[in-house]
A protein has these predicted regions:
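Charged catalytic cores and adjacent phosphate/nucleic-acid-binding surfaces used
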Residues: 1-17, 30, 52-53, 61, ...
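Charged helix-capping and loop-helix junction motifs
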Residues: 20-25, 91-94
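Divalent metal-dependent hydrolysis catalytic cores, especially in the metallo-beta-lactamase
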Residues: 27-46, 107-109
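A short helix->loop->beta-strand "cap" motif at the edges of active sites that frequently abuts
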Residues: 37, 64, 106, 154-156
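Flexible loop residues that form catalytic
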Residues: 45, 113, 137
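Short active-site-proximal "capping" loops at secondary-structure junctions
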Residues: 45-50, 72-73
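Short beta-strand/loop segments at the ligand-binding rim of alpha/beta enzyme cores
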Residues: 63, 101-110
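Aromatic-lined carbohydrate-recognition surfaces of secreted/lumenal glycan-active proteins
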Residues: 109-117
Length: 231
């Protein structure tokens, strides 16, 4: 099965003061199916709601699976919690975040550990998680290279993900396996991926800006800030 392991839906927006993602779980599922995927892990920021709704929605699409999860904001960087169904508090130390993910039956993956656009980034603390995202479609080549180097040197399980915040880029990266949680942990997942182009990232920003402007206009405020853009 071909899986997307890192994507966001509108339920990321409930935890962040901006339009972090643009599409519903159903829209992400339909986009993934069109691109030939058989499953996605929905990893909204600090919320499992999108994943739970996505899993229920996926039942109407024969042969397609959704695994709930979240991208947890730990004290020192982002950690994917794959296979959890309960929210985990943000701001905890890496070790405590990983422990809570394990207690909930999930697997912890260091998200883009050497990214320069997401701060703080885990960097060497990625070795405290169950696995390392060595290819993130929105990260730089150098950031992915650093993640690959440390993971391979320390023999850590690895993953890839698109980090999609809208349907257009879902499936840019991921893994091929039967059971993501088990196969990642055992190092059996086959990685695939291509970089999200600068054009797609800028187009997303324009859509995001339009959504923010519409919301501000309805609320009586039209002042926009560039730091509200995700990428």
């Amino acid at each position: 099965m071909k899986w997307e392991t890192h994507c966001h839906t509108v339920y990321s927006n409930r935890r962040r003061r901006r339009f972090d993602a643009l599409n519903t779980p159903r829209e992400m599922i339909e986009a993934a199916i069109q691109k030939g995927l058989q499953g996605i892990v929905i990893t909204d920021h600090d919320s499992v709601m999108g994943g739970l709704i996505g899993r229920k929605t996926a039942k109407t699409y024969a042969g397609f699976q959704v695994i709930p999860g979240a991208e947890i904001t730990s004290r020192f960087g982002h950690i994917l919690a794959i296979g959890v169904e309960t929210d985990i508090p943000k701001g905890l130390p890496v070790e405590e975040t990983v422990e809570k993910i394990r207690d909930l039956g999930g697997i912890s993956i260091a998200s883009h550990p050497y990214s320069t656009r997401v701060k703080p980034s885990l960097q060497e603390q990625c070795l405290k998680t169950d696995g390392v995202e060595i290819f993130n479609a929105t990260s730089s080549f150098l950031a992915n290279l650093k993640a690959t180097s440390i993971a391979q040197t320390r023999d850590r399980p690895t993953t890839a993900g698109s980090d999609a915040h809208w349907a257009k880029t879902v499936g840019h990266a991921g893994i091929i396996c039967d059971d993501p949680i088990s196969d990642i942990r055992k190092g059996r997942a086959i990685l695939f991926g291509e970089y999200t182009t600068l054009w797609n990232r800028r187009l997303f920003n324009l859509r995001q800006l339009a959504s923010i402007a519409t919301n501000r206009r309805l609320s009586g405020s039209v002042k926009l800030s560039s730091d509200e853009l995700s990428w």
